[in-house]
């Protein structure tokens, strides 16, 4: 017979304490929706989950970077499109001026519009900007942060070398579309430049404009290819993000069916332990 210790009551108390802890843990998981709320719940699982969360955040930013790249290219392509329309009008004027039916006075009128259109091309090349960066002026070889064609970071991780190449980045370049770059020259006090004041000049202007149109078309083609690639990159990033989030959820999120069963079990055992503790205490008092 034990006098100072009631072993049965101590066992009931210990069991009740354990079940209460399990009950609180299950309640926390059910209320937060997470299986891992702290490192003690699953140290290894928490580490993997945090790495996956970091990956998801990186993919979110990569998707934003790619979208920014598309926005930039669309601005540049829009400006190039307007330049193309201007060049087509300039070509019409040059062909008109090459006709012998025009007088020198009429050629002067057509040349006035011709020069104004060239000035507009020059203005567009200087004024086309994205986030404060001038895209088409030819003063910088890039529109980003590198000293060459810009590098868009479209991956979740740091840039890594793979067989002499790179991953997670995309190199994008926008060439200069200034008048000089496309082979045209404004008329000044000391330089006749590209003009259509005479029939011979008009013929020369047609050749120069054809070359300029080809330059603009090539640039627009490149920009279209870049945009298509970035759109595919965004789709791929979205797919990666979905699968990574799913993997992280499988590790960190609670299984409500399983945890509800555990909660109910702990609740029953906790109540049973309290009942047993009361029964043992009553027996001890009745002796």
Where do the model's predicted regions map?
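Hydrophobic topology marker
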Residues: 285-287
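Primary detection of the long, small/polar-rich alpha-helical "axial" segments characteristic
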Residues: 1-282
């Amino acid at each position: 017979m034990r006098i100072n210790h009631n072993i049965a009551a101590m066992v009931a108390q210990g069991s009740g304490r354990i079940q209460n802890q399990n009950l609180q843990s299950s309640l926390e998981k059910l209320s937060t929706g997470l299986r891992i709320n702290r490192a003690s719940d699953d140290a290894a699982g928490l580490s993997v989950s945090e790495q996956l969360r970091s990956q998801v955040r990186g993919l979110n930013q990569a998707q934003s970077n790619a979208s920014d790249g598309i926005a930039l290219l669309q601005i540049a392509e829009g400006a190039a499109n307007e330049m193309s329309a201007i060049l087509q009008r300039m070509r019409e004027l040059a062909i008109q001026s090459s006709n012998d039916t025009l007088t020198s006075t009429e050629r002067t009128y057509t040349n006035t519009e011709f020069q104004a259109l060239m000035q507009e091309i020059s203005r567009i090349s200087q004024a086309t900007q994205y986030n404060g960066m001038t895209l088409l002026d030819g003063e910088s070889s890039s529109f980003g942060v590198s000293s060459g064609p810009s590098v868009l970071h479209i991956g979740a991780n740091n840039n890594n070398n793979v067989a002499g190449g790179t991953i997670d980045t995309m190199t994008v370049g926008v060439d200069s579309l200034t008048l000089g770059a496309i082979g045209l020259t404004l008329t000044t006090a000391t330089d006749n430049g590209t003009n259509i004041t005479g029939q011979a000049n008009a013929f020369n202007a047609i050749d120069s404009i054809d070359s300029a149109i080809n330059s603009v078309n090539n640039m627009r083609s490149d920009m279209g290819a870049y945009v298509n690639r970035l759109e595919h990159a965004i789709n791929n990033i979205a797919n990666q993000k979905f699968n990574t989030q799913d993997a992280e959820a499988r590790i960190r999120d609670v299984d409500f069916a399983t945890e509800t069963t555990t909660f109910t079990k702990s609740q029953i055992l906790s109540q049973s332990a309290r009942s047993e503790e009361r029964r043992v205490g009553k027996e001890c008092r009745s002796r």
